[in-house]
From Swiss-Prot:
Similarity remark: Belongs to the bacterial ribosomal protein bL33 family.
Protein name: Large ribosomal subunit protein bL33
NCBIfam families: PRK00504.1 (NF001764), PRK00595.1 (NF001860), rpmG_bact (TIGR01023)
InterPro entries the record matches: Ribosomal_bL33 (IPR001705), Ribosomal_bL33_CS (IPR018264), Ribosomal_bL33_sf (IPR038584), Ribosomal_zn-bd (IPR011332)
Length: 59
């Protein structure tokens, strides 16, 4: 059986590079545990260095 589609606690998000605006990563986030937006230092392949990536919606 497949997963239920609806408003669960876990949502799929994308991580967007602050310097280039490119969506490099996708991950999940539990809304009950983390209310604020996710901000992580991740590797940006276009710039070839670690940059700040912020949470964004998946289109």
């Amino acid at each position: 059986m497949g997963k239920k589609k609806g408003k669960g606690a876990v949502e799929l998000i994308s991580l967007i590079c602050e310097e280039t605006g490119i969506r490099n990563y996708t991950t999940t986030k539990n809304r009950r545990n983390k209310q604020e937006k996710l901000e992580l230092m991740k590797y940006c392949p276009k710039l070839r260095k670690h940059t700040l990536h912020k949470e964004g919606k998946i289109k």
